Amino acid sequence: MLRRKPTRLELKLDDIEEFENIRKDLEARKKQKEDVEGVGTSDGEGAAGLSSDPKSREQMINDRIGYKPQLKTNNRTSQFGNFEF
């Protein structure tokens, strides 16, 4: 394997300005999106997100990610299928 000297990266003023502009733009979009969502959740759903009830919080997370939990039954057919013993 050939050894080579590390590549030098230079941070220029233009790069910093571009980064700041992009960051401000993203923050403005995020704030605008939060404002729109805040107005749209007047049915009390926004308050449910702040509640301390762990079940409702868990349910909100499950709904958001699309997870639908299945109840597990503790019988032999669910564990081993339809095998004959």
From Swiss-Prot:
Annotated segments matching region Disordered: 26-85
Pathway assigned to this chain's UniProt record: Protein modification; protein ubiquitination
InterPro entries given in the database record: APC_suCDC26
UniProt GO BP: anaphase-promoting complex-dependent catabolic process; cell division; protein branched polyubiquitination; protein K11-linked ubiquitination; protein K48-linked ubiquitination; regulation of mitotic cell cycle
Keywords assigned by UniProt, alphabetized: Cell cycle, Cell division, Coiled coil, Mitosis, Nucleus, Phosphoprotein, Ubl conjugation pathway
Keyword Phosphoprotein among UniProt keywords: yes
UniProt xrefs under Pfam families: ANAPC_CDC26
GO cellular component: anaphase-promoting complex
Modified residues (Phosphoserine): S42
Regions of compositional bias (Basic and acidic residues) in chain numbering: 26-36
Coiled coil start-end: 7-38
Polar residues: compositionally biased ranges: 71-85
Domain of life according to the entry: Eukaryota
Main location: nucleus
Location in or out of the cell: Nucleus
Record note on quaternary structure: V-shaped homodimer. Interacts with CDC16. The mammalian APC/C is composed at least of 14 distinct subunits ANAPC1, ANAPC2, CDC27/APC3, ANAPC4, ANAPC5, CDC16/APC6, ANAPC7, CDC23/APC8, ANAPC10, ANAPC11, CDC26/APC12, ANAPC13, ANAPC15 and ANAPC16 that assemble into a complex of at least 19 chains with a combined molecular mass of around 1.2 MDa; APC/C interacts with FZR1 and FBXO5.
Function, in words: Component of the anaphase promoting complex/cyclosome (APC/C), a cell cycle-regulated E3 ubiquitin ligase that controls progression through mitosis and the G1 phase of the cell cycle. The APC/C complex acts by mediating ubiquitination and subsequent degradation of target proteins: it mainly mediates the formation of 'Lys-11'-linked polyubiquitin chains and, to a lower extent, the formation of 'Lys-48'- and 'Lys-63'-linked polyubiquitin chains. The APC/C complex catalyzes assembly of branched 'Lys-11'-/'Lys-48'-linked branched ubiquitin chains on target proteins.
UniProt similarity note: Belongs to the CDC26 family.
Protein's UniProt name: Anaphase-promoting complex subunit CDC26
